[in-house]
Each structure stands twice: as C-alpha cells, then as structure tokens.
Design a protein with these regions (language model features):
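Conserved hydrophobic residue in the first alpha-helix
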Residues: 42, 75, 108, 140, ...
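Conserved ankyrin/ankyrin-like repeat signature
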Residues: 53, 85-86, 118-119, 150-151, ...
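Ankyrin repeat boundary/linker residues
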Residues: 68, 101, 133-134, 166
C-alpha cells in the first residue's frame, strides 16, 4: 500500500471512529428499525466488502454483532473475506472479537484458515484468544496443518500454546512432522515443543 493510500485509509478510519464514538453500540433493535437500518443490511454490506455502507449502518445504530439470522457475525464474515478495514470498523463499534459460531469458529480462526495474516494481526491486537480451539484442534494446529509459517510465527509470538494436544494426543509438532514441513518443525521446537 502506498503512502497516499495508507494516509487515506488512516483518515477514513479515524473519521469512522469519530462517527462511531457518537453512536450507541448497545442500541436496541427498535432503534435500528426506526432509522431504517437492519442487521440484514449490515451483513449484506460486509459480505459485499462495502466499507462505506458498513460505516453508515453502524453509525445508524445497527449492532456490530447482529447475526441477521446467519450463523456467523459480521466480524466473522469480514475476517473470512480478509477485509481489514471492515474488521477494524466492526471492532471499533464494539464487535465481540471472540464470538463463536454454532460450530465453534471465531473470526481469528476464519482469518487464519483463509490466509489473511493482516486480519489475524488486527484481531490478535484487539484481544482475540490466541489459544482458541475448534473441533478439538487449536488455532496453532490448524495453521500448522495448512503449512502457514508466517501465521504460525505470529501466533507463537502472541503466546500460542505449543503443547496443546488433541484428544488423540496429537500436537502441532506432530502435524508439522506428518507433512514433512521442516521449517514449521524447527519453529515449533524453538518455541519449546517437546521433541
């Protein structure tokens, strides 16, 4: 991203924060309906990667965690899409960074599984649980299984538990060895994984 684009993004982001600071993030659904905004509109804007529409809907009182009948929150969808701007808007509006879907996914798991390193970084900075697990596997295990060295480094730096075991006793190190990924294996051993 060029300097001009970065400056533009920061300007938009801080304007968004200023707008959101003036709106209630705990407004009731009737308040949102009174303004003509709905959770369905927010979810549609997030799915379409429409930053401005998301900002407008949040400023009109739509709650950032409104699921609109969907299994996922808007933050989870934005994380899956890799849209860091929308992720930051939703977080600034008070979205729950550790909310779980019915099947146990969180925004940080979805960002990591889709290879969105910058979004993972933003979510961790906002307090996402680095040791979250889903389906019996830790986030670190999921990242190691996918072979993503950079995200694994980030998770370890953020305090990911290198010793976490699945019900069958498998660790992240076992997964790295099974896929013959020597870089990940070395990283995990250096982080204290038992040989």
């Amino acid at each position: 991203m060029g300097r001009d684009a970065s400056s533009y993004f920061h300007l938009i982001f801080f304007l968004a924060l200023a707008l959101l600071a003036g709106c209630s993030t705990t407004g009731s659904a009737p308040e949102a309906e009174a303004t003509g905004a709905s959770p369905e509109e927010l979810m549609a804007a997030v799915r379409a990667n429409e930053d401005r529409a998301v900002l407008e809907l949040l400023s009109r009182g739509v709650r950032p965690d409104a699921q609109a009948g969907a299994e996922q929150t808007p933050l989870m969808v934005a994380a899956t899409n890799g849209n860091r701007r929308i992720v930051r808007l939703l977080l600034a509006a008070g979205a729950d960074v550790n909310a779980r879907s019915a099947d146990g996914y969180t925004a940080v798991i979805q960002a990591a599984e889709n290879g969105h390193l910058a979004v993972v970084r933003a979510l961790l900075a906002a307090g996402a649980n680095v040791n979250v697990n889903q389906g019996g596997e830790s986030l670190l295990m999921k990242v190691v299984a996918s072979g993503d060295l950079l995200t694994a480094e980030m998770l370890l730096a953020a305090g990911a538990d290198v010793h976490y075991r699945r019900a069958d006793g498998t660790t992240a190190l076992d997964l790295a060895r099974a896929s013959n990924n020597q870089d990940l294996e070395m990283l995990l051993v250096q982080a204290g994984a038992a040989r």
